[in-house]
Amino acid sequence: MASYPSGSGKPKAKYPFKKRASLQASTAAPEARGGLGAPPLQSARSLPGPAPCLKHFPLDLRTSMDGKCKEIAEELFTRSLAESELRSAPYEFPEESPIEQLEERRQRLERQISQDVKLEPDILLRAKQDFLKTDSDSDLQLYKEQGEGQGDRSLRERDVLEREFQRVTISGEEKCGVPFTDLLDAAKSVVRALFIREKYMALSLQSFCPTTRRYLQQLAEKPLETRTYEQGPDTPVSADAPVHPPALEQHPYEHCEPSTMPGDLGLGLRMVRGVVHVYTRREPDEHCSEVELPYPDLQEFVADVNVLMALIINGPIKSFCYRRLQYLSSKFQMHVLLNEMKELAAQKKVPHRDFYNIRKVDTHIHASSCMNQKHLLRFIKRAMKRHLEEIVHVEQGREQTLREVFESMNLTAYDLSVDTLDVHADRNTFHRFDKFNAKYNPIGESVLREIFIKTDNRVSGKYFAHIIKEVMSDLEESKYQNAELRLSIYGRSRDEWDKLARWAVMHRVHSPNVRWLVQVPRLFDVYRTKGQLANFQEMLENIFLPLFEATVHPASHPELHLFLEHVDGFDSVDDESKPENHVFNLESPLPEAWVEEDNPPYAYYLYYTFANMAMLNHLRRQRGFHTFVLRPHCGEAGPIHHLVSAFMLAENISHGLLLRKAPVLQYLYYLAQIGIAMSPLSNNSLFLSYHRNPLPEYLSRGLMVSLSTDDPLQFHFTKEPLMEEYSIATQVWKLSSCDMCELARNSVLMSGFSHKVKSHWLGPNYTKEGPEGNDIRRTNVPDIRVGYRYETLCQELALITQAVQSEMLETIPEEAGITMSPGPQ
């Protein structure tokens, strides 16, 4: 694909608007340029003031990779394009051997021996005594003293907790099992990666793990602001509040009159270089100024991607992270051996609470396939009996009734069965995403999909609304099951949002057990080939301009304004295994110049979705409206750099299977506690057999994972697909009751339900760290398990932050001596 650097070959577009005075030059690293000898792309716009990443790095986090990040990243991108059939990728460990090169192990052993020889005899004696300790009380006391002052946690509750379960402690000079030099390089790189994620979460008002933030603040001058739940004066929930939130007094779509909407801000909107800009006048001209709304700088984003790409293939860092992950797995197995009976006893002491009546959220499920195949079959038969003469379709300008549609297929209600419906995935869909997509068409006919599971059709989505409401009714009847349904916005026309919101409001499709996410399929190449879009920026305008308009002037989109209050965020969906023919860098065409029929890469979609969402979130927060998060499909298949982009930009992800091949990324996802909604039954039919699914491994190591169904229409058989998912996972992997309840609690924590609702479901203190944030009366998760997870995470974070701090203390005298006598000019 042709590239269009902004500095040459194409004149830069001029816009007759005043730039705001607070903008400063980009501070991205020089290696972020698109290619050798080519001028850098003109930065779209940076945040006001210094770049957050540099402002937030008071320490020297430079490593030996810093000057080579761009070259390493480009080489890895090239390999992912040209060598997709490699048996062992450069960023992963082969399954048969934990270490790729035995030479690396030999050199590491030699370094370890050389360091041990230099130890003094008294140090050796002390290390031996520490190793032979059998009583861990002193270690626990030391750990408790080191943790004092890091928060306002109650010491009494902590003392009680320490007596409740058995701990395993590691003593000695080098507790991590690698030489200090390797630990220092790995710690600096991991801390740098966590700072990068914190910066982008703060920029978009998404959440960031509070425990991780607290440890990073020890290394930073000023903490960044991230998304937090704020309690208003009328929202506090008492400790004895009921588990079920109070019912709404009226339907949320009751008042849809424009006169009841918030006022008009009178701001102007225009998309520039792929991002919506907001101006002080409705019709922007040379006399208006730009409203200060931050979004990520493109040059800085590419530089950050290069840093992370170089990080995940660094040999010593890869070995360090692999060792830490193996340690976490072994430590959890030891914890289970020592405390399993205590956890079970703690659960049995709680009255009227078990796995069946704790809150569970299906955090990854598509609305068009949220029903099982028997449910859809019964609904179609019922529609054929009651609405046979209703006009439901237009074929070549001719209206057709439901009777005529089925007569053209030579079918009657009696002929229909689950087998003729043919919507269930089978062995032929494995690694065939095209055949899986065809399963969305009942009886193989796209016309039936349009009639029954589409929101925009001849009957205004009436049938789809009815079947969704039946699914909602089943969820409400179960009380404790909830779902976050995905609805699609394609970006082909500007009125898609209004049609979707009108469908929800007109048919009153709402339930307290359901929240919405909006998925954007990555299908620009299809629309461009059909001539439906002129360039990629037109697709972005169709997706985001209506949202900005509904935020600036809600009365202009009344249904959309009401609907958005129940939308959690955005999802990016499509087949990740499709080859990408382009690498996203500074030489990539801007959205208005992307007119090729090739599809933009995954990172391109994610960056421009994130940039517009960040601007929109700041505007909506100023108005007191609900903000959004980014929760894409990621890591199901395809190249590993999808997970790199999601680590930087996404609050949660769905699938994450490829993390099993990337120990550095898996360790980073653990430290940042990024939510991962996993669907083993879906993966079993498409990409990975059930027994190879990494979910039990992720869970044992402490990653924030939950179970989800993905597509019950294709993969499940029962009326309760989420319970079916839990049931099979428990039987196959022999999960304990505590494991199941922990998965359910994780699903609520990573969901988009409101703070008040979560306070009822999990307890009013659920935002606190550690066991203080757990209420076993509501979650059925023992404080023992929550305390273990919290202490283990704190120990891992302390390991890397203390290594960085110790290196900083050692270099302070040298740096002070250098700066006191300035060198020659």
Swiss-Prot record:
Name the record gives this protein: AMP deaminase 2
Cofactor note: Binds 1 zinc ion per subunit.
CDD domains: AMPD
Active site: residue positions: H655 (proton acceptor)
Listed GO biological process terms: AMP metabolic process; ATP metabolic process; cholesterol homeostasis; cyclic purine nucleotide metabolic process; energy homeostasis; GTP metabolic process; IMP biosynthetic process; IMP salvage
EC category name: hydrolase
Similarity comment: family membership: Belongs to the metallo-dependent hydrolases superfamily. Adenosine and AMP deaminases family.
Keyword annotations of the record: Disease variant, Hereditary spastic paraplegia, Hydrolase, Metal-binding, Methylation, Neurodegeneration, Nucleotide metabolism, Phosphoprotein, Zinc
